Design a protein with these regions (language model features):
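Helix-loop-helix hairpins and the membrane-proximal interhelical loops
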Residues: 1-48, 55-72, 76, 233
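Membrane-interface elements of multi-pass transporters and channels
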Residues: 28, 32-37, 89-93, 152-157, ...
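Alpha-helical transmembrane segments and their helix-entry boundary regions
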Residues: 39-42, 53, 68-69, 96-100, ...
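Alpha-helical transmembrane segments and their membrane-interface exit regions
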Residues: 48-51, 74-81, 167-174, 218-231
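Helix-loop-helix junctions within the multi-pass membrane cores of secondary transporters/permeases
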Residues: 70-162, 166
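C-terminal ends of transmembrane helices
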Residues: 81-89, 114-117, 172-183, 225-233
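Membrane-embedded alpha-helical modules
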Residues: 125-209, 214-216, 224, 228
Length: 233
């Protein structure tokens, strides 16, 4: 039975709660520099948690627009590989549908997508739109509210909001790791190979680049290894 839009929404609701927590924190951090309207425009057009936190830091440092653009591009390079892998399930979708899916794909919605893939081989376009849109709406609303109420919550770390994104990733990964028991041995080996590629790449890159760049580069290498190995099966 094919799953519809609202089933995609329901599958993504737990991650939407994480979006709200980290979105509020992002809004609070941005409140000294951006108005709620400006924050809304940033969330609508950029829609990338890590990139938006980086942009806010650069705005606070009076950095150039070119520097901000390059930073956002570097941080979001991994989305290209995630979109490339996701597109394999939507080869019959229209151009507008694939652009819509790729534009709103995030680490979290990609994680929900992978978890769903452990249960079924059929992912529909409406389901994916539901998965993506619930996070999009939650993020925009949370960042705007956080910016508006920023003066009331001057230190988001005091409430542990800065850990919300990390906790969300842990939850998504735990669900996928548990799902390994339901997959064939080759899929389990693929997941372990990707994790190994990320770990080895990270430690080797530390000898040549800074830690933040090593994290980004290792993530991209892991995504590339996963896409290539998955395509060969």
């Amino acid at each position: 039975m094919e799953k519809d839009f609202w089933q995609g929404v329901r599958e993504a609701l737990p991650t939407a709660l994480g979006y709200i927590s980290i979105g509020l924190a992002c809004g609070v951090v941005a409140s000294p520099y951006l108005s709620p309207l400006e924050m809304a425009l940033m969330s609508v057009l950029v829609y990338a948690g890590a990139a938006q936190f980086a942009m806010i830091s650069l705005i606070a440092a009076h950095s150039s627009i070119l520097n901000m653009a390059l930073t956002v591009c570097l941080i979001n390079l991994r989305n290209m590989l995630m979109s490339l892998h996701t597109s394999s399930d939507f080869k019959d979708a229209s151009l507008a549908q694939t652009i819509g899916i790729g534009s709103l794909l995030t680490d979290e919605s990609y994680g929900v997508y992978l978890s769903e893939k452990l249960k079924t081989d059929t992912i529909t376009v409406p389901w994916m739109h539901g998965n993506n849109l619930v996070g999009y709406v939650a993020w925009i609303g949370a960042t705007v509210i956080g910016t508006a109420l920023g003066s009331l919550l001057p230190d988001p770390k005091a409430f542990g909001l800065d850990f919300a994104l990390v906790a969300m990733f842990i939850g998504i990964f735990a669900a996928q790791f548990q799902g390994m028991q339901l997959t064939e041995k080759t899929k389990t080996m693929l997941m372990l190979m990707v994790l190994l590629a990320v770990a080895v790449s990270f430690f080797l890159l530390l000898f040549f680049v800074s830690q933040p760049l090593a994290v980004l580069a290792a993530t991209l290498i892991g995504c590339f290894v996963g896409v290539v190995c998955d395509a060969r099966e």
